[in-house]
């Protein structure tokens, strides 16, 4: 027992709340963006590859975004700039109403 279990329970609760919020808001967004550190939903995304020496980093600009982060009280963000050297995954969310033949 003890503190670590309580903290774990608290974090599990936060994750659950976050998941419910995610389920509620995903319909508002067009894209899912994953970096090595974060997961975002957004309506506009711009990815620029920038060479530095022999390396490349990615500069992402997201606007009208939502951030998967259990420690933020407000997860809606007007714009986010992310710089990463790791892979970036951008997926367009399919809107169910567009799938009807």
Predicted regions, residues:
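Conserved RNA-binding domains used in RNP assembly and mRNA/RNA metabolism
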Residues: 2-101
